[in-house]
A protein has these predicted regions:
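N-terminal intrinsically disordered, low-complexity, charge/repeat-rich segments that act as generic
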Residues: 1-37
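Short, conserved turn/kink motifs that form compact alpha/beta structural patches or helix kinks used as
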Residues: 2-8, 33-144
Length: 144
């Protein structure tokens, strides 16, 4: 059993966001990104295949946004991601920030559907991020 009592007011918004996301769906998302260990001469020349890493973040909630006028008419989605889950992946992958994690992300998979990130924003309280909001669009299959 773990002690989840907040020690100060700063951690309360993060705990509230985590509880809300878990109670809404409790879903998880996979962030597919290129491996950060491709710093060899062979990989720079394209002689080795690019490797990918999947980072799982949970809890998340996905919702479809209201249609807005766009030239392509593609639906947009918003993925609400727990800041504590993002921080855990940033530490696990030894990255400097959440912005770097989202920059490396090529694809987001939720419920078997693939999405591309259009933009990332964060919500914060008391100077600490408690939720990330990813604006997504569906990834269309590429024809070869």
């Amino acid at each position: 059993m773990s002690d989840t009592a907040p020690r100060n007011a700063v951690s309360a918004p993060q705990m509230l966001a985590d509880a809300l996301l878990r109670s809404l769906t409790g879903a998880s998302a996979q962030l597919r990104m290129t491996s950060t260990t491709t710093d060899t001469n062979m990989s720079e020349l394209g002689l080795t295949a690019t490797s990918f890493v999947d980072a799982v973040v949970s809890p998340v909630a996905l919702r479809k946004l209201r249609p807005a006028w766009k030239s392509d008419g593609a639906p947009q989605w918003e993925l609400l991601v727990s800041a504590t889950a993002v921080a855990a992946q940033v530490n696990a992958l030894d990255l400097s920030s959440a912005a770097e994690l989202f920059k490396l992300t090529l694809l987001v998979a939720v419920g078997g559907q693939d999405y591309l990130i259009e933009s990332v924003t964060s919500n914060e309280a008391f100077g600490k991020v408690y939720l990330y909001r990813l604006l997504l669009r569906e990834a269309r299959p590429q024809s070869v």
